[in-house]
Amino acid sequence: MMHQIYSCSDENIEVFTTVIPSKVSSPARRRAKSSQHLLTKNVVIESDLYTHQPLELLPHRGDRRDPGDGRRFGRLQTARPPTAHPAKASARPVGISEPKTSNLCGNRAYGKSLIPPVPRISVKTSASASLEATAMGTEKGAVLMRGSRHLKKMTEEYPALPQGAEASLPLTGSASCGVPGILRKMWTRHKKKSEYVGATNSAFEAD
């Protein structure tokens, strides 16, 4: 027969086992006794492993956390130096995600990588004009036209502008995104330069 006595204190749980030998001892009973004895030893060893922490670090009764998690959390806190504040480790904001594609107009840094290259229709003008327009479209990745109204306005202001330079504009963009001031200056400078050089579109000239 085997009697187990449990004594619980503040620091750890101890299991005392008393084995009373019976008069008739068969080998099966001996095996059962030895296995039970080993079991109680394992219980004592495991309780010694987990009960060296102070009681303050264990979760309260009102907590819904798993007790295993509380033990791990307590061990992490004791291993940390006393100067480190536990709130500093969890200071990372949770609700912030990557910027979405709908917020492209206000964010120039992500405009380069998130706007896919769109095929453009370009008619040959002078070599410098077409190269400059293509470089502006690919490098900046920004919107250079607001729609048909913008095109009409440009043709009204600059009637000598060749049709090829208008056609080489990228076909991306929406009315909500405005043209940046630097790009607008570059574009007007390019138009004035093409007027002074006298670049003409040979594809639309009469033979």
UniProtKB/Swiss-Prot annotation:
Here the segments flagged for biased composition (Basic and acidic residues) are: 58-72
What residue spans carry the region label Disordered?
A: 55-102
Q: Where in the cell is it found?
A: Cell membrane; Nucleus
**Chief localization:** membrane
Leader sequence segment: none
| InterPro entries linked | Vexin, Vexin_dom
Q: What does this protein do?
A: Required for neurogenesis in the neural plate and retina. Strongly cooperates with neural bHLH factors to promote neurogenesis.
Q: Which family does it belong to?
A: Belongs to the vexin family.
Q: What is the name of this protein?
A: Vexin
Query: Quick one: which gene encodes this?
Result: VXN
